[in-house]
Design a protein with these regions (language model features):
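Walker B beta-strand of ABC/ABC-like P-loop ATPase nucleotide-binding domains
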Residues: 2
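C-terminal boundary of histidine-terminating zinc-finger modules
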Residues: 89-111
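Generic hydrophobic alpha-helical segments
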Residues: 38-42, 105-112, 116
């Protein structure tokens, strides 16, 4: 069962799902908001004996994102999802659930899925 958890402290369903999970995948953006959230929550959702995997998701096409710094601070990054102009366009058009035609992005997602399974 996959549960998309929120970052809100008062979200009981997310807290319960994270506490009950055998494996946790955390997707973080390499920006101030993502790193601040990680720093304040890094011990709260992980229980002993659970696997925790970090994935860094680049959502903006900015030149100076601190991607390397964020990856080194996370210690267990299994993958880096590259920026996708096509996916950004789909998000802005409200058709995010449509299949994207960005071949490089799709290939990277398939690689991540292979690591997970």
């Amino acid at each position: 069962v996959f549960v998309d958890c929120t970052l809100y402290n008062d979200d009981i369903i997310s807290k319960r799902a994270l506490k009950s999970a055998d494996v946790v995948f955390r997707v973080i953006t390499p920006d101030l908001k993502g790193t601040t959230w990680y720093s304040s929550h890094k011990n709260s959702e992980r229980e002993e004996g659970k696997d925790l995997f970090n994935i860094v998701n680049i959502t903006e096409n900015e030149l100076y994102l601190p991607t390397e710094e964020v990856c080194s601070s996370l210690h267990s990054v299994i993958s880096l999802i590259p920026y996708s102009k096509a996916l950004k366009r789909q998000m802005l058009e409200g058709v995010l659930y449509d299949k994207t035609k960005d071949k490089a992005f799709n290939k990277k997602i398939q690689t991540i899925v292979s690591k997970i399974l």
